[in-house]
Amino acid sequence: MNKQQNNLQDIFLNSARKNKIPVTVYLSTGFKLNGIVKGFDSFTVILDSEGKQMLIYKHAITTVTPEKPILFVDNES
């Protein structure tokens, strides 16, 4: 049986969401958003910024910078 492997993007966003790590999201327009990742799917990210939710399309994101490092741990070892 094949195990579904999460991609790096999903691991990164899920860790930021679970640990409520504040992130800065840079958009392709140069605009900068700060907040907490509340959820995500294949095409979008929900960011909570100052109590307001924003639906951001991933194709508009250039960079996501966490406030503190996100550790990547292989849970299968």
UniProtKB/Swiss-Prot annotation:
GO terms for biological process: regulation of DNA-templated transcription; regulation of RNA stability; regulation of translation, ncRNA-mediated. InterPro entries: Hfq, LSM_dom_sf, Sm. Belongs to the Hfq family. Pfam families: Hfq (PF17209). The keyword RNA-binding applies. GO terms for cellular component: cytosol. Homohexamer. This is RNA-binding protein Hfq.
